Amino acid sequence: MAANRPAIFAVPAAAALLLWPALLNGYPIVFADTGTYLSQAIHLYAGWDRPVFYSLFMLPLHATVTLWPVVVAQALMTAWLLWLACRVLAPGSSGWVFVAGVAVLSVCTWLPWIVCELMPDMFTPLLVLVLCLLTFVPERLTGRERVLLVGLATFMIASQQSSVPLACVLAPVLAATGAAIGGPDRPHRHQDKRRAAKVCATGVAFHSPSWPGLA
């Protein structure tokens, strides 16, 4: 519990820093496809060209009232994943250092813009981060964190069609790289490969209902 105390402050603070484009705009940023993602869950239909899972993710958050909770949730998800990466890769870093790093990212990169956009595009870079954590440092994660990351990776793959080829190529490459770096005695090397295969297979399976529409 003590190890999680910095996150109670750091994650919400970092999430707030990532929301400045929406605050500057006066509203979450919309794109041409945003309407499709919103309408699928509201009107109960599944378009062949847009997976429904991002629509289902948004519906309980906006509840057809306001879209602000969606971008707040996206900012919190992003901040938590960045905090998790910081904690396992640089365990000596303080919460203040983490928030300062996110402040730099929020000013110098495009990250806050995709976080504030009502599109699943933010899941592409986050998927890379999640797969790297699961592959290279699974032993530094708690069992609950590994389960959450596997669930998030599956959701991210299922939410965007472009994530399918990305994950199918990246996951086995990362698993092989992790095994090669760690050598034959690296713990979890076999679990890495199985986990990558299961995540990819599940995410791809969720896409299968839309394949007939591609013909």
Q: Each PLM stretch: what is its role?
A:
Residues 52, 59, 63-67, 71, ...:
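Aromatic- and kink-enriched transmembrane "portal" helix at the membrane-lumen/periplasm boundary
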Residues 165, 184-187, 194, 198-215:
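Juxtamembrane membrane-water interface segments immediately following transmembrane helices
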Residues 12-20, 96-110, 115-117, 125, ...:
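Transmembrane and membrane-interface helices of multi-pass
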Residues 24-37, 45-57, 61-65:
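Extracytoplasmic catalytic/substrate-binding loops of multi-pass membrane glycan-assembly enzymes
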Residues 146-161, 201-209:
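Membrane-interface alpha helices of multi-pass inner-membrane proteins
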Residues 68-92, 103, 107, 126, ...:
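Transmembrane-helix motifs of polytopic, lipid-linked glycan transferases
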Residues 84, 123-140, 145-153, 170-177:
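Specific aromatic-rich, kink-prone transmembrane helix
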Residues 4-29, 106-107, 204-214:
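Transmembrane signal-anchor helices characteristic of membrane glycosylation enzymes that use polyprenol
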